């Protein structure tokens, strides 16, 4: 029952809103606009140079064009290439933010309609439940309907930023980047609204989570299988509800690819997480699914065609992804089921989620036995025969984003050796461009997958499903050690599986950091990639390391929207440990994170506009980002400029000094070793105590020497005096520092970029 709905015998009274009960933003700056935070952005750009990497020199945005902007030229509207590149950064960030905003809007409205105005409760150990919302919107939401205030703010600001990319609007590259930061920041708010709403409504884990089975062979293919693909858990919850109502919980397998997989496993841990986005085409072609249910985001544009080819029926459920399918929402349920079972309708769009769930379950049950007999299994003879059709032209390798040695693998397969093809599976990003280029139309991905299946037989792992928020008690225990530097850092491995090489490289980085006592958080497709990394005993990192927000522990927060809890943990350190007020207080909180909390994000396989929005938002809050090499295609990085303004004030005394950390805000690494070194370095903060700085520098120096066989050349930037130098490395480091003319300097106790924070 709604809190504004009264029911008596024979009478129901509904009250829309009560005068005086409307929550209002409080604090210095509730619901800040672009211009409200432009001065904070300028402080960032005064030290971090915006480096542009335009993908194309041409601008085709209006009918004046196309205009060549190369070599200092300007377009017909007057724009230059730097501003145009920044404009596209803002545009792509808006696209990503719009995805999460639409997702959050749908979840909130769906929950209000289906369950009423649910109270927001993230468990007894989480009191600061919505740190991003409180910091930006200015009040603490109590029920799901309160979250609509945040959505209104998001939609208002997103519309403004998007309008700025129109011809004849913004013209300055830094102001475009400022707008990109704004869109990213409100994207982070959308993440929190979506995840908090679904945790409250669907009783997801609240700070702890079980281990679940992971991988395509975790599915019991002797049962009817429903495969959920996308990011919005609402259709999946309806499937689970229908199965429970019918008593079919144990009779039908519910599987998931991408973030829907994490979220449905958070609702019911009997569901199976089978793989990330990069495996979507592979696993659809395997024919595991009797029915594929689509919701939204990260869905391949050819999924309907690919699913139908192996006899899987497809049901689209969101108007964001109608997929050209007939809208049968208003058709009788039994008619839809009959036509899908017969194959007359191989794919349909059903916007009514309850009906979609019923159809999915009933169709899966009825087609399963027939489909099971039709699914082809890997055949070594057929695989060898296909490999012999390869011309060795190399067209596939030229378009492969990872330059995989496909031709060599085909030659080996033609001679009956399939190991080369099988080895490509973990390095394949699943784009299938090789197949589009092949003059003989070889199904290259199928061949790679078949070779892998012949070798693997059965691949099952254990992963920890998403646990959602970080508990307040965890923040109290580690807030001090993080701020002082005794815990060397908090590193988040997030985003897409567009890895530049073997998927297991992510696991190598994470394990190295865990062994060095960093707190590691993960989410989304990267959290799945970690599940594929095992030790010699076959154990995954989730089985080896504890699920706690503490030194040397590994936390999976959940799906992409759960990234809000990663940022939220940093905000909660400011609120719980430092007693900073949150409401409407973005600048002070971001300043605290930038100067005192050693946190960093690694997006090793970044691909989507959503990942750009998430990461760009994090940088505005003061959390630096390391991309993989694909991050260059986002077109702008924020690289430290040693000639910039690195002035930091001591809030106690007003004393000024230069502190060159974190040295970058957005960085792209060429290989995993460079990414690991940068992640460690970007956890260095002005607030580090001598002991904390020693710990951080020891990790930085040891890794740099291991990979590059020399001391880091930028050590003088981070050594304030000899007490910062690790004892075991002191002689070597001090000798080097003296050679390069380093001079000791004093640190400060309360670093801030904000002059208004100075008390002395």
Curated annotation (Swiss-Prot):
The UniProt record gives the binding positions of [4Fe-4S] cluster 2 as: 59, 62, 67, 77
Q: Which cofactor does it need?
A: [4Fe-4S] cluster; [Ni-4Fe-4S] cluster
Task: Please share the entry's free-text remark on the cofactor.
Answer: Binds 7 [4Fe-4S] clusters per heterotetramer. Binds 2 [Ni-4Fe-4S] clusters per heterotetramer.
- List positions binding [4Fe-4S] cluster 1: 56, 60
Give a yes or no for keyword Transmembrane in this entry.
no
InterPro entries attached to this UniProt entry: 4Fe4S_Fe-S-bd (IPR017896), 4Fe4S_Fe_S_CS (IPR017900), CdhA (IPR004460), CO_DH_a-bundle (IPR016101), HCP/CODH (IPR004137), Prismane-like_a/b-sand (IPR016099), Prismane-like_sf (IPR011254)
Where along the chain is [4Fe-4S] cluster 4 bound?
400, 428, 431, 434
Residues recorded as binding CO, renumbered to this chain, are 100
Give the residues annotated as coiled coil: none
Query: Where would I find the 4Fe-4S ferredoxin-type domain in this sequence?
Result: 381-410, 418-450
GO biological process assignments:
acetyl-CoA metabolic process; generation of precursor metabolites and energy; response to hydrogen peroxide
Q: Where does [Ni-4Fe-4S] cluster bind?
A: 231, 259, 298, 496, 525, 560
Is Repeat among this UniProt entry's keywords? yes
List the EC numbers from the record: 1.2.7.4
Keywords, A to Z?
4Fe-4S, Iron, Iron-sulfur, Metal-binding, Nickel, Oxidoreductase, Repeat
Q: How does it assemble?
A: Heterotetramer of two alpha and two epsilon subunits. The ACDS complex is made up of alpha, epsilon, beta, gamma and delta subunits with a probable stoichiometry of (alpha(2)epsilon(2))(4)-beta(8)-(gamma(1)delta(1))(8).
Q: Which PANTHER family match?
A: ACETYL-COA DECARBONYLASE_SYNTHASE COMPLEX SUBUNIT ALPHA, HYDROXYLAMINE REDUCTASE
What's the stated role of this polypeptide? Part of the ACDS complex that catalyzes the reversible cleavage of acetyl-CoA, allowing autotrophic growth from CO(2). The alpha-epsilon subcomponent functions as a carbon monoxide dehydrogenase.
- Full protein name: Acetyl-CoA decarbonylase/synthase complex subunit alpha 1
The gene name on file is cdhA1
